[in-house]
Amino acid sequence: TNFRGYHGTDKSHFDSLDKDKEFSSQTLPCDLGNGLYFFIDRVNKTGEAIENAKKYLSRWKPKYKNKIIVEMELDLEQDKVLDLDDQVNQDIFNLFIDENEEDIYNELNHLIENNTKNRGNIDGLVLEIMIRAYDIDVKAIMKETYTQFDMSKQRKRSNIPNGKELCLRGYSAIKKKSICKELW
């Protein structure tokens, strides 16, 4: 299955984007686990992903000097993509938390305080523990999500999504990368 993802970053990071990274086991992973995050278009929402990448950059990366939006073409086997909008996958995820709550919170308590931990969303940690426990071969995780793009707004979190994210774990799926917008 082909995906087109948009990632907002600084131009200095462009060359290293498709290189595998080591993630610290000392910090809480982001909401969809460890990997490279993209916005992807939702059904019938063409252009939303690139706009979300742009808004993400201006809201969350104000110090970047040479802001760019990188477009990447990803080729992923469907059975290696964990779709967390799928009801069955949500049920398995919730059951895993119920059955492993003590282990999850023990691991959480040993992590370093950071912004992700302060936000209180432990989904990424649960996903990492679940993938480890079940030895799941997953190359990407995707989900419709809510991202706060405007810090002047009161709404910080929501269960109603304003976009869709894909967290790429297997970087060999990147078939092409290009700068599609330079914003500095």
Question: Where do the language-model regions lie?
Answer:
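Arginine/glycine-rich "motif VI" loop of SF2 helicases in the C-terminal RecA-like domain
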Residues: 60-65
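Extended catalytic/binding region for NAD+/ADP-ribose chemistry, centered on the ART fold
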Residues: 25-57
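Active-site and NAD+-binding cores of ADP-ribose-processing enzymes
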Residues: 2, 8, 18-19, 66-184
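Short, solvent-exposed loop/turn segments at secondary-structure junctions
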Residues: 11-12, 44-45, 77
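ADP-ribose/NAD+-binding catalytic cleft of ART/PARP-like enzymes
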Residues: 1-32
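Small-side-chain structural scaffolding
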Residues: 5-9, 46-49, 53, 72
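Short helix/loop capping segments that flank catalytic or ligand/cofactor-binding pockets
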Residues: 15, 47-49, 82
